[in-house]
Amino acid sequence: MLRSSIRLLYIRRTSPLLRSLSSSSSSSSSKRFDSAKPLFNSHRIISLPISTTGAKLSRSEHSMAASSEPKSLYDFTVKDAKGNDVDLSIYKGKVLLIVNVASQCGLTNSNYTELAQLYEKYKGHGFEILAFPCNQFGNQEPGTNEEIVQFACTRFKAEYPIFDKVDVNGDKAAPVYKFLKSSKGGLFGDGIKWNFAKFLVDKDGNVVDRFAPTTSPLSIEKDVKKLLGVTA
């Protein structure tokens, strides 16, 4: 038995045919392995640029979003009572009092009367009132823009601009009012509570103060004078 095993081993080592077959098999396996190498290399080459490009786009988009954010009241355009665009940058250098008005409110008479008095006294010093009709509080401003302007100008001699009717709260709130509220929040949150809420804006378009609907216009005269630089 031992002799048979030794003889077989000797034949395998010395037989030219067996050595040739073994060498051919080994060479074929090596070639198959070598031919697979470029596949792995090509995968490594094309996988690198993808995430880098994505990162650059993300930074660019973030930069564009940041640059488009409004920085002052002058970045907004609104509609006047006739539907024409008004770029609020025309009020640069003026002190502004922005009010959401209504024609059928319990605060209508006192506010419209005092607004007219305040405007008459300081319009020559660079003071302007911007009135925005709003029907969100008790449906107390139901009329058309034309009716609202006629009411304010005829009954209260309003000479300041009255703009297009807007929403001041909710998803449909005018962008300018979203800016005003975010700049100066109220006592119980940012939302406008009623008709005749007031925002005071300085000569640079910054919102510097906010007053409740029940605050009378003449009671904030000292604040207006301070921003105007009027001492008398």
Curated annotation (Swiss-Prot):
- E.C. number(s) listed in UniProt: 1.11.1.12
Enzyme type, top EC level: oxidoreductase
What residue ranges carry the coiled-coil annotation?
Answer: none
> Care to name a GO molecular-function term for this sequence?
phospholipid-hydroperoxide glutathione peroxidase activity
Q: Where is the active site?
A: C105
Record flagged with keyword Oxidoreductase: yes
Q: Which UniProt keywords apply?
A: Mitochondrion, Oxidoreductase, Peroxidase, Stress response, Transit peptide
User: Which CDD domains does this chain map to?
Assistant: GSH_Peroxidase
Q: Which GO terms describe its cellular component?
A: chloroplast; cytosol; mitochondrion; plasma membrane
SUPFAM superfamilies according to UniProt: Thioredoxin-like (SSF52833)
Q: What does induction of this protein depend on? A: By salt stress, osmotic stress, cold treatment, and metals. Up-regulated by salicylic acid (SA), jasmonic acid (JA), abscisic acid (ABA) and auxin.
Is Transit peptide found in the keyword set? yes
- Please state the protein's primary subcellular location: mitochondrion
The residue span given for the transit peptide is: 1-54
Identify the tissues in which this protein is expressed. Answer: Expressed at a low but detectable level in leaves, stems, and flowers, but at a higher level in siliques and even higher in roots. Predominantly expressed in seeds.
GO-annotated biological processes:
response to oxidative stress
Q: Where in the cell is it found?
A: Mitochondrion
Per the record, what are the reactions this protein catalyses?
a hydroperoxy polyunsaturated fatty acid + 2 glutathione = a hydroxy polyunsaturated fatty acid + glutathione disulfide + H2O
InterPro entries registered for this protein in UniProt? Glutathione_peroxidase, GPX_AS, GPX_CS, Thioredoxin-like_sf, Thioredoxin_domain
Stored PANTHER family: GLUTATHIONE PEROXIDASE (PTHR11592), PHOSPHOLIPID HYDROPEROXIDE GLUTATHIONE PEROXIDASE 6, MITOCHONDRIAL-RELATED (PTHR11592:SF118)
Family that this chain belongs to: Belongs to the glutathione peroxidase family.
Q: Per its database record, what is this protein's job? A: Protects cells and enzymes from oxidative damage, by catalyzing the reduction of hydrogen peroxide, lipid peroxides and organic hydroperoxide, by glutathione.
Its protein name is Probable phospholipid hydroperoxide glutathione peroxidase 6, mitochondrial
